[in-house]
From Swiss-Prot:
NCBIfam families: asp_carb_tr (TIGR00670), PRK00856.1 (NF002032)
Enzyme superclass (EC): transferase
InterPro entries named in the record: Asp/Orn_carbamoyltranf_P-bd (IPR006132), Asp/Orn_carbamoylTrfase (IPR006130), Asp/Orn_carbamoylTrfase_sf (IPR036901), Asp_carbamoyltransf (IPR002082), Asp_carbamoyltransf_Asp/Orn-bd (IPR006131)
Protein's name according to its UniProt entry: Aspartate carbamoyltransferase catalytic subunit
Catalysed reactions, as listed in the record: carbamoyl phosphate + L-aspartate = N-carbamoyl-L-aspartate + phosphate + H(+)
GO CC entries: cytosol
């Protein structure tokens, strides 16, 4: 594997290998050493979970790590990201973890520079977040073991969610039994890759084994979609009452950051069914597996 850009570019066998390798790292704490490999983290959007877990993954693998501070870099002088990568590559850096607001940017960089560097997509606009899909599936398999009988519900702003896009794809690749995308009509995607869409919260959650709650993007609510927070809260929030429609042992997940009291209640986020912190933990091991697969190949 030369680059890690989209789930759609991976075979089901490659995905399953990443999942098993992540669980191996978690349970054995036996990590390979790649001390000769240098990696740079370029985050053009704010991040806590993804940025830090990638850095921890890199350090667990004994890689040399460079974190580019955009505020003090030549990016403030107008340097294009393509030139930044070429410059860093000339210094001996081969691997680049990149988050950017532009859809498809990492793919474009891989097309232009792919002969000399390895690109890892840490999120591009509303398009894809492949490492999140891997860690989410690690978390689900760890708890539920099998996927073919599961009903998974994903709730929120599906239209603008790179998390939802990548998750639909991984569910399709791995043969998840049923995927339901629950969203107000105004946030429903024009194209669904896998699963079905509904704006009926209770029906969508009925009998679910896993419930994934997405962040409400307040900036889009106020500027683009003219959907107020009170409406969303009253009709689509994950509360103890709405969660009761799912199975009693349903997992509750959230990619973070959470808007408590908007898309999810604190009593649900912190409750016995919550696997949100387990997702964060698994993110480190999932990203270790991703990095190893690039270096080893």
């Amino acid at each position: 594997m030369k680059h890690f850009l989209e789930i759609s570019q991976l075979s089901s066998e490659q995905i399953e290998s990443l999942l098993q390798r992540a669980l191996y790292f978690k349970h054995t704490k036996q990590y390979p050493s790649y001390s000769q490999s240098i990696i740079a983290n370029l985050f053009y959007e704010n991040s806590t979970r993804t940025r830090i877990s990638f850095e921890l993954a890199e350090r667990h693998l004994a890689m040399s790590v460079v974190n580019l501070d955009l505020q003090t870099s030549s990016e403030t002088k107008g340097e294009a990201i393509e030139d930044t990568i070429r410059t860093l590559a000339a210094m001996g850096i081969q691997y680049f973890v990149i988050r950017h607001k532009q859809d498809g940017l990492q793919q474009n960089l891989a097309n232009k520079l792919g002969d000399t560097v390895n690109i890892i997509n840490a999120g591009d606009g509303t398009h894809a977040h492949p490492s999140q899909a891997i860690l989410d599936m690690v978390t689900i398999i760890e708890q539920k073991k099998r996927l073919d009988k599961l009903k998974i519900a994903i709730l929120g702003n599906i239209k603008h969610s790179r998390v939802a896009n990548s998750f639909q794809c991984i569910c399709s690749k791995l043969g998840v039994g049923e995927l339901v995308l629950i969203s107000p009509e105004i946030w429903q995607p024009s194209q669904v890759h896998f699963g079905r869409v509904t704006d009926n919260l209770n029906e969508g959650l009925e009998g679910a084994d896993v419930v994934i709650c997405l962040r409400v993007q307040k900036e889009r609510l106020l500027q683009d979609d003219h959907l107020d927070l009170d409406f969303y809260r009253n009709n689509f929030a994950l509360t103890q009452k709405s969660l009761s429609y799912a199975k009693p042992d349903a997992m509750v997940m959230h990619p973070g950051p959470m808007n408590r009291g908007v898309e999810i209640d604190s009593e649900v986020a912190d409750g016995n069914q919550s696997c949100i912190l387990q997702q964060v933990t698994n993110g480190v091991y999932a990203r270790m597996a991703i990095l190893e697969s690039l270096i080893a190949s």
